[in-house]
């Protein structure tokens, strides 16, 4: 059977440009790097949409035996009474502390922010009452 040729006419294949159907063969490292780039782009878009969530510093001192490389904190900042710029985000126009539904913080973070705002007010870093903008017009 191998030596016999069939008399069936062969279908004609039209030549199509090679550029359209040329596939790129990617190595595993190239595929992984593309996946990382896509994931990083998604993370960046999510960071732009989310408000900055502050970190609560630890209460106790921890003895560090080994020095670990510091992890970069992109979207987070430590809450401290000295960071008046960060605390002013959580104060309304009249000088009142904004509620949780506006700040979108957890209950623990909201309590800590309120406590640090009160501390900063006592220290004189933040005002107790601020006049609304309509007052100056």
UniProtKB/Swiss-Prot annotation:
Domain of life of the organism encoding this protein: Eukaryota
This protein's name: Small ribosomal subunit protein bS18c
Family, similarity comment: Belongs to the bacterial ribosomal protein bS18 family.
Matches recorded under Gene3D superfamilies: Ribosomal protein S18
GO MF term set: small ribosomal subunit rRNA binding; structural constituent of ribosome
Compartments where located: Plastid, Chloroplast
UniProt GO cellular component terms: chloroplast; mitochondrial small ribosomal subunit
Assembly and binders: Part of the 30S ribosomal subunit.
Main location: plastid
Lineage of the organism: Eukaryota, Viridiplantae, Chlorophyta, core chlorophytes, Chlorophyceae
Source species: Chlamydomonas reinhardtii
UniProt keyword terms in alphabetical order: Chloroplast, Plastid, Ribonucleoprotein, Ribosomal protein, RNA-binding, rRNA-binding
GO biological process, one term: translation
HAMAP family: Ribosomal_bS18 (MF_00270)
Matches recorded under InterPro entries: Ribosomal_bS18 (IPR001648), Ribosomal_bS18_sf (IPR036870)
